[in-house]
Amino acid sequence: MTNQRYVRTVQKQIPLIPNKNIIGEPEKKNTAMAMGVAAAWIYKRDPKAIIINLATDHLIQKPAAYRKTLKAAAKIAYEQDKLVAVGIVPTFPHTGLGYIHIGKKISEDGSMPAHEMKGFTEKPNLANAKKFIKT
């Protein structure tokens, strides 16, 4: 799923993905709506599919570790039939990002622990972002 105007660019940049699998957003309605449309589209074609939704505005400094994390997340999703959110531990309060509130540990693959998600706060105000950093 991408913005309609980027479909051709994505097709050129990722030639291994069949063009029919690159979807242009029918209408710009932000991330959650795009994720829902993409999930419905994929589910219609394969109800057992494991879906990984990735933002495109981040820098991946350790590609091998990133791939390992995504594989571990997909494994948990498949084996435990769980919805998985991958996050990083923030180093400073940021009001433009969402915060995952973690619960009990459900598994650990080497250095990658997996926790239940107690909640999620999307783009908190600065006071709350500062609280989240401390916890």
Label for each model-derived stretch:
Residues 3, 56, 88:
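Cofactor-binding loop segments of dinucleotide-utilizing enzymes, especially the Rossmann-like FAD-
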